[in-house]
Curated annotation (Swiss-Prot):
Its main location: cytoplasm. Its cofactor is [4Fe-4S] cluster. GO terms for biological process: iron-sulfur cluster assembly. It is found in: Cytoplasm. This is Cytosolic Fe-S cluster assembly factor Nubp1 homolog. GO terms for cellular component: cytosol. [4Fe-4S] cluster 1 binds at C9, C23, C26, C32. [4Fe-4S] cluster 2 binds at C240, C243. InterPro entries: Mrp/NBP35_ATP-bd, NUBP1/Nbp35, P-loop_NTPase, YlxH/NBP35. It comes from the Eukaryota. SUPFAM superfamilies: P-loop containing nucleoside triphosphate hydrolases (SSF52540). Keywords: 4Fe-4S, ATP-binding, Cytoplasm, Iron, Iron-sulfur, Metal-binding, Nucleotide-binding. The gene is Nubp1. The lineage of its organism: Eukaryota, Metazoa, Ecdysozoa, Arthropoda, Hexapoda.
Amino acid sequence: MQAPPPEHCPGVESEQAGLVSACAGCPNQRICSDPNKKLEDPGKALVAAAMKDVKHKLLILSGKGGVGKSTVTTLLTRYLARSYPDSNFGVLDIDICGPSQPRLLGAVGENVHQSGSGWSPVGIDDNVCLMSIGFLLGSVDDAIIWRGPKKNGMIRQFLSEVDWGTLDLLLLDTPPGTSDEHLSVVSYLRDDSAPDSLKAIIVTTPQEVALLDVRKEINFCKKQRIPIVGVVENMSSFRCGNCGNSSEIFPAKTGGAAAMCQEMDVPLLGSLPLDPQVTRACDSGEDITAINNSTTEALATICSKIMASL
């Protein structure tokens, strides 16, 4: 029988299992550090029990920072919640060092409460809830300076100790790249008996400097056996509010997301414009999905494809 994992356990699937300072004194240290032993992370069973009523999990990924993953996560959540009022949606912010969902969803200053069932996520709308480390900080300016094992422990807590209730879809906002956060959340949520329960959306901008890293993220998903719902091209164009002309702020010199999707055999879900209304709404935490403009028209197409894929 395995002992409970220490608070900052790196996870038995990690290359650091049994080797980092958090493992000191753990009864399983010798077993975890044995390269010939393959163990199931005891935290995985706790996560599975806590997430049993969450039907679908959707990772929002990108290899590049600054492409708008968090903004896209917010827009998708808002539009889906408005379009499917009888469904329940959750957002989990696992960008541990840069949590932005409380700001984007208008929940700055909210507190997380604890009950016998665990942490209660913050309610955003009637059918939307949010959990983020941003709610656990003393100030929005507090820096989180953690190594991988501590991030892993925090993600495990979010997945196993938050009372999500019954959700039709949980969207997970991730940091850029393929780092500890990504490996942790995939190891806990991937279920080989239900491979379609965890899927991914990739966010990019049109220019090649972003596409270079996004290709790596797509390959990460393929290696980790995570089905890719498709790619969202963000900030594809900018329409001037004065003259009405459209401009390419990030020129697609190599064909943009469309060419990359064809090259890598993944679907293109759609393109979102660079919209000043969205920028202002993100800063204030307002919901703009009720208005009719080019952004919401694009969201309608993207969200219908997402729901059809689940």
